[in-house]
Amino acid sequence: NLWQFGMMIQHTTRENPLFKYFSYGCYCGWGGGGPLDATDRCCFVHDCCYG
């Protein structure tokens, strides 16, 4: 779920995902378009699975 995804990001990057990634790229937060980089692709995959 979204909470677990956020905790995984926080554990891996040591960053607060809400502030760091909410409006990042095309897929982190309210997304659309094509992934910009590896981080944005991770959000894209999450959207495909849980969106």
UniProtKB/Swiss-Prot annotation:
Tissue occurrence: Expressed by the venom gland.
GO annotation (BP), single: phospholipid metabolic process
Cofactor: binding details: Binds 1 Ca(2+) ion.
Disulfide bond annotation, renumbered to this chain: C28-C43
GO CC annotations on file: extracellular region
UniProt subcellular location: Secreted
Positions annotated as active site in the UniProt record: H46
Coiled-coil segments on the chain, per record: none
Reactions listed under catalytic activity: a 1,2-diacyl-sn-glycero-3-phosphocholine + H2O = a 1-acyl-sn-glycero-3-phosphocholine + a fatty acid + H(+)
Annotated Ca(2+) binding sites: Y27, G29, G31, D47
EC number of the protein: 3.1.1.4
Cofactor(s) needed by this chain: Ca(2+)
Family assignment from sequence similarity: Belongs to the phospholipase A2 family. Group II subfamily. D49 sub-subfamily.
Function: Snake venom phospholipase A2 (PLA2) that impairs hemostasis. PLA2 catalyzes the calcium-dependent hydrolysis of the 2-acyl groups in 3-sn-phosphoglycerides.
The name this protein goes by in its record: Basic phospholipase A2 Bfon11
Species of origin: Bothrops fonsecai (Fonseca's lancehead)
